[in-house]
Amino acid sequence: MKEFIIKANKAVTNGEINLKDLPGSSGRLDLICRCVNSAFFLSHDLRRDTIFYSVNYGNPNPPVALKFIGDELKRLSPDERSIAMFIQKALSKDASEIWKESTSGIYYSNHEFKEIILEKKNSGKKIFYLHLNGKPLENFDFKNESDVVFILGDHIGLSKEDEEFLEEIGAEQISLSPLELHADHCIILVHNVLDRLK
């Protein structure tokens, strides 16, 4: 299983989303929609072995965590507007500590970014932090890693506190490129590497 977790620093946390202005008034929700697209969509199918989390910290009710489970997703289209409509439906509900299903394969809760990562770590999963200054991807051998979790930052990135937390729990830093990439592009590159190991 491949899992991706992104901290969306400004992404809205309620259902008041302007579908015509995802980058602006919705706190770069366009970025999250593109990440969902990259995480799951193939030419004529969906990736069933992938889970994607967006932990939103924008106004008015942070945090709200969204979880997309590839094996359960239905009726989701690859365009940003369609994905945003499904996100809007989830964000229109009251989040609690319990994961609740909004639509098929899409869940919401008020879990914190660190809380979700720690849960993965405690369940024995290998944590990787995608970072410009990490070790080159080609230096890692994923053949024996069946359950991997990749941490991403949005356009703002992770805070120093977040990075210290990741270091404390033993997350390994991986660099995908000498250039700074968009989060959705990082997801595609990771998929490509892992696809070739099958």
From Swiss-Prot:
One of its GO terms (molecular function) is tRNA methyltransferase activity. It is found in: Cytoplasm. It holds the Pfam family Methyltrn_RNA_2. GO terms for cellular component: cytoplasm. Keywords: Cytoplasm, Methyltransferase, S-adenosyl-L-methionine, Transferase, tRNA processing. Its main location: cytoplasm. S-adenosyl-L-methionine binds at residues 130, 153, 176-181, 186. InterPro entries: Alpha/beta_knot_MTases (IPR029028), TrmY (IPR007158), tRNA_m1G_MTases_N (IPR029026). Its EC number is 2.1.1.257. GO terms for biological process: tRNA methylation. It comes from the Archaea. It is an enzyme of class 2 (transferase). It catalyses: pseudouridine(54) in tRNA + S-adenosyl-L-methionine = N(1)-methylpseudouridine(54) in tRNA + S-adenosyl-L-homocysteine + H(+). The keyword Disulfide bond does not apply. Specifically catalyzes the N1-methylation of pseudouridine at position 54 (Psi54) in tRNAs. Belongs to the methyltransferase superfamily. TrmY family. HAMAP family: tRNA_methyltr_TrmY. Homodimer. This is tRNA (pseudouridine(54)-N(1))-methyltransferase. It comes from Methanococcus vannielii (strain ATCC 35089 / DSM 1224 / JCM 13029 / OCM 148 / SB). The gene is trmY.
